[in-house]
Amino acid sequence: MPGPAAGSRARVYAEVNSLRSREYWDYEAHVPSWGNQDDYQLVRKLGRGKYSEVFEAINITNNERVVVKILKPVKKKKIKREVKILENLRGGTNIINLIDTVKDPVSKTPALVFEYINNTDFKQLYQILTDFDIRFYMYELLKALDYCHSMGIMHRDVKPHNVMIDHQQKKLRLIDWGLAEFYHPAQEYNVRVASRYFKGPELLVDYQMYDYSLDMWSLGCMLASMIFRKEPFFHGQDNYDQLVRIAKVLGTDELYGYLKKYHIELDPHFNDILGQHSRKRWENFIHSENRHLVSPEVLDLLDKLLRYDHQQRLTAKEAMEHPYFYPVVKEQSQPSSENAVLSSGLTTAR
């Protein structure tokens, strides 16, 4: 009879929540204050998810454009968790800003009110991004991830749909904190999180003692899809096939090494479908259409993110220090860069 899986803990920010008061992370005890939804007039439907419907709206008290996320009937505990996390992260770098929590006066349905972002659909946007754009937006996303991780929170659903980009204003926001959770060392978490193409190997092999590094895998998948112009990069037909797609790139021997290290027993179904695959070189994915987006630096970064072993993946802070981002850091350290954008807008207006 195989023993239990080996333990694991985050390499960074592991004790953040134990150093805070219980009130910070005990979301079940949180009592959100619900305002009146009548202050907001719904303008148009922006989309719908598994747990909500999202609308563009106007705050009639100040004419401000906002986004209203009307929550579908779901466990109170889940709503409390999302609200508590959004309140804890309020004001964080590139984190979507929660403006209000309201309820419909009649139906009593809860809704979350957020800042409005003039988002471009990623399927169109990713086709026009330059090499520098990709570096820039990935760096901005890393700021959001380092911030939430430093606050003891894993997002657990990083994917293009949850990264709003206003390309004209070069503004990025990480949205949809409905699956986010507080990190406590040695806690075993639900593996039914994240979206299939962005699920880390730990989820696919049912390893529950995961941590912030799960988000770094998802970010790696996004980066790969952007630089190789292959959306999604790992295109599994189901959760089993998803691991097969990953193994065809990262290799099966490497997968077995990971399983051995953490004493993970693989679902027997994998015996029939995994096969044997060698590790592929990242250069294999370069072709004429994506060559202008690929550099030795980005392949090195990608290689350090897309690792089976979650403990080996770069942390958000480590990733931000990677040479791939030097051009972005250089631009952001020049105080004139923002003024230049402003003045270029002004010169035409004069």
From Swiss-Prot:
Assigned protein family: Belongs to the protein kinase superfamily. Ser/Thr protein kinase family. CK2 subfamily.
Record's catalysed reaction(s): L-seryl-[protein] + ATP = O-phospho-L-seryl-[protein] + ADP + H(+); L-threonyl-[protein] + ATP = O-phospho-L-threonyl-[protein] + ADP + H(+)
GO MF annotation list: ATP binding; protein serine kinase activity; protein serine/threonine kinase activity
Source organism of this protein record: Gallus gallus (Chicken)
An annotated GO BP: DNA damage response
Record-linked SMART domains: S_TKc (SM00220)
Catalytic site positions: 157
InterPro entries linked: CK2_alpha, Kinase-like_dom_sf, Prot_kinase_dom, Protein_kinase_ATP_BS, Ser/Thr_kinase_AS
Functional note: Casein kinases are operationally defined by their preferential utilization of acidic proteins such as caseins as substrates. The alpha and alpha' chains contain the catalytic site. Participates in Wnt signaling.
Single GO cellular component term: cytosol
Binding site for ATP: 46-54, 69
Protein name: Casein kinase II subunit alpha'
Coiled-coil regions listed in the entry: none
Enzyme class name: transferase
Keyword list, A-Z: ATP-binding, Kinase, Nucleotide-binding, Serine/threonine-protein kinase, Transferase, Wnt signaling pathway
Enzyme Commission numbers on file: 2.7.11.1
Signal peptide span: none
Quaternary assembly: Tetramer composed of an alpha chain, an alpha' and two beta chains.
Domain (Protein kinase): residue spans on this chain: 40-325
